[in-house]
Amino acid sequence: MAVSNNNNNNNSKERTQNIKEVEEKLGENPKITLKGGGKTKIMDFEQLRKPHCVRPSARFPVEDTAGGLLRTGGHRPQISDEEVSKRHHEQSHGQEDH
């Protein structure tokens, strides 16, 4: 087991050395190029660390977990009885013509 621990320590030291070398090559303000959707954007790493959305999302009351349909005053939106009869009438007359 001593050999295994020794190998792990060597690998860790090599990784640390590699990271230091890469950081030296990149300099103080490293840039990254992102390509997608036919566009190319050059960003620095600090921009990637920052959140993309500066506004926090709205918090909904815990007891209201039914989703967006019930956030309209506590009831599901419905069409009126008149609209239901009108649509039923239009559908039944539309089928007779065919």
Swiss-Prot record:
Residues 58-98 are annotated as: Disordered. This is Uncharacterized protein YLR361C-A. It comes from Saccharomyces cerevisiae (strain ATCC 204508 / S288c) (Baker's yeast).
